[in-house]
Curated annotation (Swiss-Prot):
Tissues in which the protein is found: Expressed in roots, leaves, flowers, immature seeds and seed coat. Expressed in young shoots, tiller buds, endosperm seven days after fertilization, and interconnecting tissues such as pulvini and nodes.
Lineage: Eukaryota, Viridiplantae, Streptophyta, Embryophyta, Tracheophyta
Protein name: Hexokinase-3
Keyword Aminoacyl-tRNA synthetase found: no
Localization of this protein: Mitochondrion outer membrane
Gene Ontology CC annotations of this record: cytosol; mitochondrial outer membrane; mitochondrion
Residues annotated as binding D-glucose: 188-189, 223-224, 250, 278, 309
Catalytic activity: a D-hexose + ATP = a D-hexose 6-phosphate + ADP + H(+); D-fructose + ATP = D-fructose 6-phosphate + ADP + H(+); D-glucose + ATP = D-glucose 6-phosphate + ADP + H(+)
Keywords: ATP-binding, Glycolysis, Kinase, Membrane, Mitochondrion, Mitochondrion outer membrane, Nucleotide-binding, Transferase, Transmembrane, Transmembrane helix
Statement: the UniProt record of this protein carries the keyword Protein biosynthesis: no
Length: 500
């Protein structure tokens, strides 16, 4: 071989070696980036861990906060609001009752006909949007609009003899004064009618109804959680609590009046009262908080509030996963050039998170579609898609298990968790059948979430006690439940309803 040929050969060898070295370096870099993504996943999983021992600590913390909230206003993160609902439907109610459900940009009017034996004979529902200008206008404008809608709804009905009872579900913060009255604390959900704050919203509606010539009055002012409890109790008198787990979350339960220390001397016909916990604001150092939860809290308008809700409700689960993906994109390049799209807050909704977690196809085709179409991440390899599924699973599992701990906290406060003497003072006895009414799209529409919650209940309570606890899905407590409460708390309540 001549010198020229030798030089060419040496040059080719050098180029080949350089290319090989570059490929090796690139593969090593890719492996390092992947290892970083896996490390972030493991770190997140460890931070979200909810072993049974930790869940029991959350249970105990919930009970402590419940006691504190019942002892004094402002003494706990849990508001423990009195509802003045001291009787619940028993299934013996009969007649036709109406309800209005106002809790957002739409409102509903319902006519519910009930028969003895826990039978809903007939139900009619109409939904209407509230014009945006009314959400920022005047009190009279809003309530006159609602009253007129009820008047139009009643036209053609033949059950308008005498004064009619109305249940009013008003899902905004209210300081309850009685079962049929309460003053607005503040507007939420885009409403900003200044002259309503501090006024009795039931009285505002009653005045509007009278102005429309309607012989209708509000006999029960409730929130959606209390309505869910009422509907659950209507079907099953062993129902002692209700939980909503949807875009938001809350719980209420039946408390003995002598345990409500902040209202000494409170008397009811039944000796009990429904307490609205507002448990979304629960907090404890035992909750498994991660750096992503802190980032989420920082980007919300209600910073340092609703800590429990931000861990378990549908409004936030997708965003927690998005924050994890964004950090992975920044530190590992596992998503290629998609870091920009992952920087958009709330781009991943919880329904998409659920669809990702529940994709059981061999190649995770639904995950690939969601990544491509909604997160702008094209051609994610299968191992990346599996990583995405795992993140969504971790978020879901933590949320469901914490929700289960909250439910057990209520049961422990009532002495129904099998731990012996009740915190409310009752002695040890045989396990009693206990029903918790549960409503909300996260529990009803996300089977994996439901399975994790049910599994955690058994882990915390033990199989023997858990056999006596039933979570009963209850639909439309805010509508039908409010109408049933109108029946119980109407002028003929002495013939209807039952002790609680």
């Amino acid at each position: 071989m001549g010198r020229v040929g030798l030089g060419v050969a040496v040059g080719c060898a050098a180029v080949t070696c350089a290319i090989a070295a570059a490929l090796v370096a690139r593969r090593a870099s890719a492996r390092a980036r992947w290892r970083r993504a896996v490390a972030l996943l493991r770190e997140f999983e460890e931070g979200c861990a909810t072993p049974p021992a930790r869940l029991r600590q959350v249970v105990d913390a919930m009970v402590v906060e419940m006691h504190a909230g019942l002892a004094s206003d402002g003494g706990s993160k849990l508001k423990m609001l009195l509802t003045f609902v001291d009787a619940l439907p028993s299934g013996s109610e009969e007649g036709v009752y109406y309800s209005i459900d106002l809790g957002g940009t739409n409102f509903r009017v319902l006519r519910v006909q009930v028969g003895a034996g826990s039978v809903i004979v007939n139900q009619k529902v109409e939904q209407q949007p509230i014009p945006e200008e009314l959400t920022k206008g005047t009190t009279e404008g809003l309530f006159n609009f609602v009253a007129l809608a009820l008047k139009n709804f009643l036209e053609g009905e033949d059950d308008q003899d005498g004064k009619m009872a109305l249940g009013f579900t008003f899902s905004f913060p209210v300081r309850q004064i009685s079962v049929s009255s309460g003053s607005l604390i503040r507007w939420t959900k885009g409403f900003s009618i200044r002259d309503t704050v501090g006024r009795d919203v039931a009285q505002c509606l009653n005045e509007a109804l009278a102005n429309c010539g309607l012989n209708v009055r509000v006999t029960a002012l409730v929130n959606d959680t209390v309505g869910t409890l009422a509907l659950g109790h209507y079907y099953d008198e062993d129902t002692v609590a209700a939980v909503i787990i949807g875009s938001g979350t809350n719980a209420c339960y039946i408390e003995r009046t002598d345990a409500i220390i902040k209202c000494q001397g409170l008397l009811t016909n039944s000796g009990g009262m429904v307490v609205n916990m507002e448990w979304g604001n629960f907090w404890s150092s035992h909750l498994p908080r991660t750096p992503y939860d802190i980032l989420l809290d920082d980007e919300t308008h209600n910073r340092n509030d609703q800590g429990f809700e931000k861990m378990i409700s549908g409004m936030y689960l997708g965003e927690i996963a998005r924050l994890v993906f964004h950090r992975m994109a920044q530190e590992s390049d596992v998503f290629g050039d998609a870091a920009d799209s992952l920087s958009n807050p709330f781009i991943l909704s919880t329904p998409f998170l659920a669809a990702i977690r529940e994709d059981d196809s061999p190649d995770l085709s639904e995950v690939r579609r969601i990544l491509r179409e909604h997160l702008k991440i094209p051609d994610a390899p299968l191992k990346t898609r599996r990583l995405v599924v795992k993140v969504c699973d971790i978020v879901t599992r933590r949320a469901a298990r914490l929700a289960a701990a909250g439910i057990v906290g209520i049961l422990k406060k009532l002495g129904r968790d099998g731990s012996g003497a009740a915190s409310s003072g009752r002695g040890r006895g045989q396990p009693r059948r206990t029903v918790v009414a549960i409503e909300g799209g996260l529990y009803q529409g996300y089977p994996v979430f439901r399975e994790y919650l049910d599994e955690a209940l058994v882990e915390i309570l033990g199989e023997e006690v858990a056999r006596n606890v039933t979570l009963r899905v209850t639909e439309d407590g805010s509508g039908v439940g409010a109408a049933l409460l109108a029946a119980v708390h109407s002028s003929n309540r002495q013939q209807q309803g039952g002790p609680i």
